[in-house]
Regions:
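N-terminal glycine-rich flavin-associated loop
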Residues: 86-106
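Short beta-strand-to-turn element immediately C-terminal to the catalytic PLP-Schiff-base lysine
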Residues: 101-103, 143, 169-172, 187-189, ...
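Alpha-helical interface subdomain recognition
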Residues: 1-83, 102-105, 114, 118-119, ...
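Flexible, small-/acidic-enriched active-site or ligand-binding loops
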Residues: 133, 137-139, 188-220
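A short, Trp-centered hydrophobic/proline-enriched beta-strand micro-motif
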Residues: 118-127, 169
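A short, charged helix-loop
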Residues: 209-237
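Cytochrome P450 C-terminal beta-domain/meander region
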Residues: 134-152
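A short core secondary-structure module
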Residues: 148, 152-196
């Protein structure tokens, strides 16, 4: 099989790299991290829209690019290499996928088109304080009241919730708390009076929010998909997000490797570069191998993440997440060890990549969660 990018994909990757190098340099990221009025650059977000990045996974009739899963992976790898702070995962990958998979034609037109234009941001409010990685564990309730629903509950660690215009909220319309049946999705105006939130930065500097809904009134027109049957959509959206995170981690790991290799070539001890010591050469090779293995499984996850066969999708995504988490931990620790104290300073770029890789490992299921899911699928096969 040929895994090389096409000419168009190489051009896309090069163009995106140049955009991020010009608009998202380390000094620019530092300014974003220090600013108090928002956790990302609105100017760069509009650059993404002008570039066509926000429309990659969407149909051309909505103004999208009609791109493939590999096109999304290429973009995510570049985001990982440049530590992009923008809510691409939250709005395009997660929110956009929920609308694409469950929305009516009117809902798609109303939400996807302005999102592609950079005029609207989405965020998925699936997690709750007690749910951890099990997004079917939902206590938030939606009660039917005439032609509308009243939603009450709390949502935790809503990625991109700090800047979202609309929230896609999971709520239980029937069934017990941890039941996969009886879940529904609703499009909720994030600025509604009965919606309150506390925005904050994750440890890598990206924005998230805790969200509380107090008897929020939502019309039936804002029900996304079929009432009581939202779990397959939530599960699929989460797999797409996990695959995207795996690709982003590959890009981040590549920069950690390159930064460490350059340091080994320039840092001198005992009269010669420390990269001349064989034990460090072997460790560097191990880091490169881990990154390559992660990239291979991330590619498989990207290709299978949009499949309707749940078992195939779960197996590919979980395998990738396990390998990426293990590789990210090994590469982060080895990179810091070979750098010494400078590797954990706030000003040096390596530490910023390590923080991002730590957040990736904890998002949408850690190693134990995905090992358990992969093991159950293997046993059932």
């Amino acid at each position: 099989m040929n895994f090389e990018y096409s000419e168009e994909q190489n051009l896309f990757s090069d163009s995106l790299r140049k955009l991020l190098e010009n608009k998202n340099a380390n000094a620019d990221r530092r300014k974003v991290l220090e600013q108090e009025d928002g956790f990302h650059s609105e100017a760069l977000w509009q650059n993404f829209a002008d570039f066509g990045l926000l429309g990659i996974p969407f149909d051309e009739k909505f103004g999208g690019f009609g791109g493939s899963a590999i096109d999304v992976m290429i973009a995510e790898i570049e985001f990982g290499k440049h530590l992009s702070m923008e809510p691409y995962l939250a709005s395009v990958i997660l929110g956009g996928a929920a609308v694409r998979l469950a929305g009516s034609e009117d809902q798609k037109q109303a939400l996807i088109a302005p999102m592609i234009a950079g005029e609207l941001k989405l965020a998925c409010a699936f997690g709750e304080p007690q749910s951890r990685h099990d997004f079917f564990d939902v206590e938030t309730r939606a009660k039917k009241s005439g032609d509308s629903y009243k939603i009450t509950g709390a949502k935790a660690v809503v990625i991109g919730g700090d800047c979202a215009d609309n929230l896609i909220v999971s709520a239980r319309t029937s069934g017990a708390t941890a039941n996969k049946d009886g879940l529904s999705l609703f499009i909720v105006d994030a600025s509604a009076k009965s919606v309150s939130k506390r925005a904050y930065r994750l440890t890598d500097g990206r924005g998230a929010a805790e969200v509380w809904l107090d008897n929020v009134s939502v019309s039936a027109e804002h029900l996304l998909g079929e009432e009581g049957n939202a779990w397959p959509v939530i599960d699929h959206v989460t797999d797409l997000g996990t695959a995207a995170l795996c690709a982003e981690a590959v890009g981040a790991m590549q920069i950690v490797n390159e930064t460490t290799l350059e340091y080994l070539r320039t840092r001198e001890q005992f009269g010669r570069p420390i990269g001349k010591f064989q034990v460090l050469q072997h460790r560097m090779v191990d880091m490169m191998i881990e990154k390559e293995q992660s990239e291979s499984l991330a590619l498989l996850a990207s290709m299978d993440a949009d499949k309707t066969d749940t078992a195939v999708r779960h197996r590919a995504v979980s395998a990738a997440k396990v390998e990426v988490c293990n590789a990210a931990r090994f590469i982060s620790e080895a990179g810091i060890q070979m750098h010494g104290g400078i590797g954990v300073t706030e000003e040096y770029v390596l530490g910023q990549f390590v923080k991002r890789l730590n957040v990736v490992q904890a998002t949408f299921g850690d190693v134990d969660h995905h090992l358990q899911r992969f093991g159950a699928l293997t046993a059932a096969a």
